[in-house]
Swiss-Prot record:
Gene Ontology terms: biological process: amino acid biosynthetic process; aromatic amino acid family biosynthetic process; chorismate biosynthetic process
Transmembrane segments: none
PANTHER family reported in the protein's UniProt record: CHORISMATE SYNTHASE
UniProt protein name: Chorismate synthase
Pathway info: Metabolic intermediate biosynthesis; chorismate biosynthesis; chorismate from D-erythrose 4-phosphate and phosphoenolpyruvate: step 7/7
Protein family membership: Belongs to the chorismate synthase family.
Gene symbol of the encoding locus: aroC
Amino acid sequence: MSGNTLGKLFTVTTFGESHGPALGCIVDGCPPGLALCETDIQIDLDRRRPGKSRHTTQRREPDQVQILSGVFEGKTTGTPIGLLIENVDQRSRDYDKIKEQIRPGHADYTYLQKYGLRDYRGGGRSSARETAMRVAAGAIAKKYLAERHGVKIRGYLAQLGPIRAERFDWEIVEKNPFFCPDPDKISELEAYMDALRKEGDSIGARINVVATGVPPGLGEPVFDRLDADLAHALMSINAVKGVEIGVGFAAVTQKGTDHRDPLTPEGFLSNHAGGVLGGISTGQDILASIALKPTSSLRLPERTINCRGESAEVVTTGRHDPCVGIRATPIAEAMAALVLMDHLLRHRAQNMDVQPSLPSIPAYPGGGG
């Protein structure tokens, strides 16, 4: 299996399976001298960690990260950073009854078609459990971007099923299990998820990510456009079926006079482009949005086939998230951070001596909500 590495200068390679002994990753290309300890990484891992509320999977993984290399006396050395998280709450017996069945909506069918075998225990490598290492690596990128360049990356739940956030308060996001910015929607979300759990069904969600303080000039103008790499990274998250940058698909109904972002000496007057023009950052907030499908692991029966291609019925009895979007906010933040970190280092390597004659102008003040 190839395709386990992201990035060109700041690279992240992950390994491990849902029910294996551990998950791990190698972060290469981190500049030396960054103060780093396990606590710096654990903060984001705890935000993603399963089993924290009744609305997520009850698999209880502490996700305690270990730094194996690349840090000496509390600072990065510039050598590869090895990270490890042990799996401690696997319950593989939950999957014994379905090991011969192909779960609809999962990677069972495609893995068997591609590799001729699959790890039926929780999906193996295709499980969202793998994203723990993305969050761990992303925490390093977020710390560097914030401390060295003033870049802040935050996300929130914009919509869960039919429930949309209508008010916006960053202070509320970290104070509820949904990462929802609208205090008036929390009780509605809780009631909706309680009813959904009783039904045994699942639901999709939308997560928005905002990166502020991104300098202009990041991104390459053709195949490695900043927005293209962001879309690639965000689309690689399990269950993501759609990505938007800026207003995204709403641009279809906008006229050019509505969509273009006017410039004045005092700053931009809008940010429909989401902080990227021509594949290069403008200095405005980077705005990205992802749509996550409802999980297909349900205790409701569904038609399928078995490993011999015969008709069968499947009921999944393992522990699963009824809405994967509830825990996706720190994952989306991490993927955005990894892309921005990589492009910042690439820009510095090629363009550090460039002195633009054109002055930078301020970002549109309403571009991050």
